[in-house]
Curated annotation (Swiss-Prot):
This is Micrurotoxin 2. CDD domains: TFP_snake_toxin. Belongs to the three-finger toxin family. Ancestral subfamily. It is found in: Secreted. Allosteric modulator of the GABA(A) receptor (GABR), possibly increasing receptor affinity for the agonist, thus enhancing receptor opening and macroscopic desensitization. In vivo, intracerebroventricular injection into mice results in periods of reduced basal activity, followed by bursts of intense seizures and death. Keywords: Chloride channel impairing toxin, Disulfide bond, Ion channel impairing toxin, Neurotoxin, Secreted, Toxin. InterPro entries: Snake_3FTx, Snake_toxin-like_sf, Toxin_cobra-type. It comes from Micrurus mipartitus (Red-tailed coral snake). GO terms for cellular component: extracellular region. Negative results: does not bind to nicotinic acetylcholine receptors (nAChR), muscarinic acetylcholine receptors (mAChR), acetylcholinesterase (AChE) or to receptors for glycine and glutamate. One of its GO terms (molecular function) is toxin activity. Disulfide bonds join 3-24, 6-11, 17-41, 45-57, 58-63. SUPFAM superfamilies: Snake toxin-like.
Amino acid sequence: LTCKTCPFTTCPNSESCPGGQSICYQRKWEEHHGERIERRCVANCPAFGSHDTSLLCCTRDNCN
């Protein structure tokens, strides 16, 4: 599986997930400087946090 890895809306960077991590993840939240984005490979989809504005977990290449 290959997942996007950069903290921007448009994300050209991706990486192959290590063994045991078969989910692509994207989390967005608001900070005083604007929207923040985190993208990476994970083993389990995390819980939706109280400050999150969106949370995406998917299992196709570059789906995050």
